[in-house]
A protein has these predicted regions:
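Extracellular/periplasmic carbohydrate-active domains that bind, remodel
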Residues: 1-246
Length: 246
């Protein structure tokens, strides 16, 4: 295929915008209940828009806690400058599921942002998405300063040795999960894995079997595991985003 024959297909959306702050969402509070409330508001509005031709949810300036959200067809989320969508870790809100890792069935938790079999979806704007990955991720000692390592040990004393370095784990559950590493597509494995919940870090943005996807302008930060995972998607446009683990 020659370059001049290739066309970038980006999603188009109905010219209807809904401001999150007008829908009953709460800004400035970073607790589990606020996150659940805001996620309900967002998910309800996504469903309503998708069922009525689509549109855009605008997240304005401010800090907005959330539990997992799911994008549906013909819906865009735009995060304005100085707007932060921060996902709050909670075992009840992020259940374990069987999904894929490098093409193989595996166990993870639900992702903060998911779209599956959706057509025309987008996350845009100059704001930020924070996946609270620092509550999930292991840390290798040689990647931090001595002072930072001391601070980590004050949070958790769960450390194991490798030939390369010491690795800090945020919880006992994640440490034991690393030793067990239960991976299977069987329901009984999913049940057994519950004892090692914190080990099964989610990807932050999970896009599965979607068509016409746009990610533009947003900073995706502090991811629990992989930052953005498009899996068997078509026409994915990534434009001027920042993706970082911290």
């Amino acid at each position: 295929m020659y370059r001049e024959d290739y066309k970038v297909t980006v999603p188009q959306f109905k010219r209807l915008e809904v401001l999150l702050s007008d829908c009953g969402a709460i800004s400035g509070k970073l607790d589990i209940e606020t996150g659940r409330h805001n996620a309900r508001v967002i998910n309800d509005k996504v469903k309503e828009l998708s069922e009525n031709g689509g549109g855009t949810i605008v997240i304005p300036k401010g800090i907005w806690a959330s539990a997992p959200i799911r994008l549906l067809s013909d819906v865009s989320i735009r995060i304005e400058s100085q707007g932060l969508l921060k996902f709050i870790k909670s075992k009840e809100d992020y259940p374990l599921i069987i999904t894929n890792y490098e093409g193989q069935p595996c166990i993870r938790t639900v992702s903060p942002i998911t779209a599956e079999n959706a057509v025309n979806v987008a996350i845009t704007g100059m704001g930020m998405v924070d996946g609270s990955g620092d509550e999930w991720r292991p840390v290798k000692k040689f990647k931090v300063t001595d002072k930072q390592w001391e601070q980590l040990l004050k949070k958790s004393d769960n450390v194991f040795e490798t030939k390369e370095t010491q690795i800090w784990m945020p919880t006992k559950s994640s440490l034991l999960g690393n030793e067990k590493n239960i991976q299977s597509d069987k329901d009984e494995a999913l049940e057994e894995a519950r004892d090692y919940y914190d080990f099964y870090r989610p990807v932050m943005v999970s896009l599965r079997h979607c068509t016409n996807v746009l990610l533009s302008g947003v900073t995706f930060m502090n991811s629990p595991a992989w930052n953005i995972h498009p899996f068997f998607c078509e026409n994915v446009t990534i434009d001027n985003i920042k993706a970082r683990m911290q």
